[in-house]
Amino acid sequence: MRIGILGGTFDPIHYGHIRPAIEVKHALALDKILLMPNHIPPHKQQPNLTTAQRLKMVADVCSQLDGFELCDIEAKRDTPSYTVVTLEQLKSLHPEHELFFIMGMDSFLQLKSWYEWQRLFDFAHLVVCQRPGWQLDAAHPMQQILTARSHAHQETHEGHAKNTHKNSGQIFPVTITPQDISSTQIREQLAKGEIPVDLLMPVTLDYIQNQQLYLP
């Protein structure tokens, strides 16, 4: 089974998370996507909502999307959510599956600052989402890694990637539709009493309004 993994604070989860994940799922013919809320994100300040509230929002979204599941493996931890630890744990639980960890190009460019980043490739492939026409500068330090591990996939009529012989360790660049949406933007709108109907799934907006979340 080919499993995509998208982690994040999801404070709140919005179309800027969901639409790229759907595009990646189709582009790489993934069997499912795990949406994985962080508990204590190492690179971010503490979230505005509780872990339970963010889990509820993500679970609601997954119930509306075919092939999407909530993964609470990081939310159950009392320690920071280091990706390499999570992937190692997921791989030990599902050694027969191919894991595809999804990230944006901005995160990929900062990869060397991640905890034990080299070991990520022992457990999963990386999927690097990029904007149409975007190219990494040839002199950038990450270009060598991208080139060495990049898997130029050729899609069949079913959209399945050919020639994937390795169970982990490759990089799959995927061009996605740009989404100019941020959780900060949504929280600010909600605090002003605005209703961002175009940025959130209806099930998420209903939960936020019913629970009166993100109010000043």
Curated annotation (Swiss-Prot):
The keyword tRNA processing does not apply. Pathway: Cofactor biosynthesis; NAD(+) biosynthesis; deamido-NAD(+) from nicotinate D-ribonucleotide: step 1/1. Keywords: ATP-binding, NAD, Nucleotide-binding, Nucleotidyltransferase, Pyridine nucleotide biosynthesis, Transferase. InterPro entries: Cyt_trans-like, NadD/NMNAT, Rossmann-like_a/b/a_fold. One of its GO terms (molecular function) is nicotinate-nucleotide adenylyltransferase activity. GO terms for biological process: NAD biosynthetic process. Its EC number is 2.7.7.18. It holds the Pfam family CTP_transf_like. It comes from the Bacteria. Catalyzes the reversible adenylation of nicotinate mononucleotide (NaMN) to nicotinic acid adenine dinucleotide (NaAD). Belongs to the NadD family. NCBIfam families: cyt_tran_rel, nicotinate (nicotinamide) nucleotide adenylyltransferase, PRK00071.1-1, PRK00071.1-3. This is Probable nicotinate-nucleotide adenylyltransferase. It comes from Shewanella baltica (strain OS195). The gene is nadD.
